[in-house]
């Protein structure tokens, strides 16, 4: 979404910046994919045993670990960005734009890692629809907010970064409408 929007801004530097920024977040978040995968497996086992107390504990543990990691990433954002750019060779303009994108999008880490935990938990609870609804909502919000900020307000790279950040938290807010462990207990 971000590349598509900045691709019309008239400079290849914007596309390069989104590519570099996206790559950094793909690496960072891929490392913590265990929050989703590990949570889904253990939750599925506990749910199959009808152990709803363990199901709830698994969700709380996973979210707690995810938030700890997210706040650590926020605290270490400057060294992470500096170290990353010692390995990534770009032009000064692309590095500057990618840094702007990084420093805005890193604030989405609590939402992203929290959603990893919830997605794994929902999949383990045999509910893959809700994570899909969250992903669809995030994409719609990202497109709408990014278009508004970039083309409506002329914010360029900052606009797509804020659009991405807004979409991440919109997905997290959607959790307030989601089934809780008590809802699953009532259905059994």
Where would I find each of the regions flagged by the language model?
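Membrane-embedded alpha-helical segments of multi-pass transporters/permeases
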Residues: 74-82, 143, 147, 172-176
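Interfacial/gating helices of multi-pass transporter permease domains
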Residues: 6-26, 93-97, 157-158
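Single conserved hydrophobic/aromatic residue that forms the stacking wall/gate
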Residues: 176-187
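Short membrane-interface helical motifs at transmembrane helix boundaries
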Residues: 72-103
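Membrane-interface helix-loop junctions in multi-pass transport and translocation proteins
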Residues: 139-172
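Residue-level recognition of transmembrane alpha-helices
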Residues: 19-22, 66, 105, 109, ...
